[in-house]
């Protein structure tokens, strides 16, 4: 709907552009998975520290963009961030808990995307009525705050020398 409203595209043209945007996100996610996540010697904390700002920037780009090309770059950034964030957050969450909590934590991590699919669309629809780009701006702000909180938590959890 965003592409129809913002770019005045027909439903068919909007669907094609959404498909290309999603493909750019998926390609970036796969690329980062097969390169950095699988082969780089980054710690999970390092990947978290890199991926969350990338996601915040991606949402900010979606909020501010004015051309489809910037939208595609933003979606590629989204794929890079998600491709690093999800596995590193899952690994960190299970590492920092007791063995008896690991199955519960893994279940919560697995359920988190489903909660986003349940609560995200109605909340985004409310924001969309105020300003069609507002859901992206709010997501960027929330990710920025989350990034700061995670940096603080990682700094506190870092071993002291």
How would you name each of these model-derived features?
Residues 31-44, 128:
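Helix-to-loop junctions at the C-terminal end of transmembrane segments
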Residues 46-61:
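Structural signature of the two symmetry-related core transmembrane helices
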Residues 1-17:
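Short amphipathic helix-loop junctions that connect adjacent transmembrane helices
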Residues 20-23, 27, 76, 107-115:
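Transmembrane alpha-helical cores of Major Facilitator Superfamily
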Residues 63-74:
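Helix-loop junctions at membrane interfaces in 12-TM secondary transporters
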Residues 15, 97-109:
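Loop-to-transmembrane helix entry/capping segments in MFS-fold secondary transporters
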């Amino acid at each position: 709907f965003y592409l129809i409203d913002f770019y005045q595209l027909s439903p068919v043209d909007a669907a094609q552009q959404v498909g290309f945007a999603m493909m750019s996100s998926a390609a970036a996610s796969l690329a980062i998975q097969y390169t950095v996540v699988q082969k780089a010697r980054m710690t999970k904390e390092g990947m978290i520290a890199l991926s969350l700002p990338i996601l915040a920037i991606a949402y900010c780009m979606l909020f501010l963009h004015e051309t489809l090309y910037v939208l595609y770059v933003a979606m590629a950034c989204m794929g890079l961030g998600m491709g690093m964030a999800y596995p590193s957050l899952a690994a960190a969450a299970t590492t920092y808990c007791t063995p008896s909590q690991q199955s519960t934590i893994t279940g919560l991590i697995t359920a988190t995307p489903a909660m986003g699919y349940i609560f995200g669309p109605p909340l985004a629809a409310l924001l969309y009525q105020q300003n069609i780009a507002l859901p992206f701006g709010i997501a960027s702000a929330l990710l920025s705050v989350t990034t700061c909180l995670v940096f603080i938590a990682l700094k506190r959890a870092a071993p002291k020398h």
